[in-house]
Amino acid sequence: MAIHDANYIVSTSEFSSGVLISNFLLFNFIIISHSSLLSNTTTTTTTTTTTTNTKSTLHRSG
């Protein structure tokens, strides 16, 4: 009985780690898809800022 319990514990822990991994991957996927949406918006803002900074730098040096 004790051996059977030990096997059960191992299989349960393997199962729960599998669930954790799949949840983790799903969570990462959600974060990645959300952050890519956010970064698309952020990239537009960053590009505008960079362009403005470059223009002002060129203006100063020229």
From Swiss-Prot:
The keyword Membrane applies. Residues 41-56 have a biased composition (Low complexity). GO terms for cellular component: membrane. Residues 41-62 are annotated as: Disordered. Keywords: Membrane, Transmembrane, Transmembrane helix. It is a single-pass membrane protein. The chain crosses the membrane at residues 15-37. This is Putative uncharacterized transmembrane protein DDB_G0286087.
